[in-house]
Amino acid sequence: IYVLMICTGLTAYYTGRSIGRSRCAGAVTMVLYTMGHYHLEDVYTRFALGEVAAMVFIPLAFLAIYDLTEMGHSRKGLLCVSYSCLMLSHTISFVLCVVMGIIWMCARWKRIAACRRLIGAVCMEALACAVLTCYYWLPVLEQFADGMFYVSNEPAFYTHEETQTLLAIVSGRYSVAFIEIGILALMVFVSIYKKVYNKKALMCLVTAAVLLVCETKIFPWKLIDRTPFVSIQFPWRLNMFTEFFVALGLALQSVDIIKLLPSYRRNACLCAAGSILIGIFSLNMVWNIELGGYVNYPEGYADNTGSTDSIGFWEWLPAEGDLATSVGSENSGMVKCEDTYIRGRYGSDGSYEFDAGEAAGECIVPKYYYKGYEACSVSKSGATEYITVSKDAQTGLVKLDNIQKYSKVRVYYKNTIIQKTSKCISFCGAVLILMHAAYISIRKSKRRVKQHGEK
């Protein structure tokens, strides 16, 4: 968590400094984004490490698309790297960033269309991102093609049921601390009055306000629930972006206002100190208000499977599966061979072993079926035989055919052909990209040396 927090601060600082062209802007963006309410919620209340990891790369993803249209694509490869990291850390955040990128491209289409080189650059970086991450998304698509899952038929959450009220937004639950929006608006209004308002900061304010409104029922989330975007689950996830735009807007506007005042360095320090105070305010809200509802667990809570089973979302289980008849049943963890139940052993590598004893024929193993499972049995004579593995249509568990008496059976997961191939593709792609980056770097250094020699 500490490493992720530090990395979040570094990426936010780099983004704020690059867009604001000021170290002060970078510092303010870093503090406000890292100590933003929703970020602290993710760390201390929701313990959503995937989303916390994704928040490291959201500033870089925005900087990549901003650089593409506003800076002449000077940071080549940033789009590929940031979106690849988002894909591998938190898929939903990746999808939301793709939507953000599409909206940005549509808004700046004239500039992109005027420079066809940018279209080619986007396509090449998107292709590189797909190659680098195919070892993740190709196996996922393979599993979806092989069977149905709860996430397809019965999502755990519907977005229209998880919207925020305006009161909840103002109070700050799962939201940015509203004081940040207020300060940003005040700074923009003061700057407009002084006629030094920052257009980028104003756009950040408008974007943040729109995102907050989108968390309410005003946005047509019921229509979203009819599409695959139902996997967003919680509309208040948008606070990842709201917090970033608030932090960036405050940073950009602060720099412009500070320039009006004498003693730039002193006022820059005061600005950074003020942002830290806002961050401490957010931390206090999370610590004193939110955490209070999570520390008073009843005695024996962790030992009660009825309480803890729901922590692991079941939406990635096969659609035929039912926790009540597997994890929550009296015979949980046991192999069913007709009317006989056999206690087996789970291995540290995810495998499952059991001794068949008198049982023979068809058996149901307490492991949910996914494409790639294999099984083998060792008879008394020591002969090894591979067993046909399939999915039980009633429970979604692994089904084994033709178990022999007194054999030792082991069920384990083995990579499919697509998984092995996709890993090779990603590895080769990464090597080629690194070689290309090294070649570009060497060529640039030679060019600098040549130019220096000519001078």
Please state what every model-predicted region is.
Residues 291-350:
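Membrane-interface segments at or immediately adjacent to transmembrane helices
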Residues 75, 128, 279, 306-308, ...:
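Alpha-helical protein-protein interaction elements
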Residues 1-293, 408-412, 418-455:
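Membrane-embedded transmembrane-helix bundle of lipid-linked glycan/lipid transferases
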Residues 326-455:
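Active-site-proximal, structured, solvent-exposed surfaces of multi-pass membrane proteins
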Residues 47-48, 53-57, 228, 236-238, ...:
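Solvent-exposed, flexible loop/coil residues
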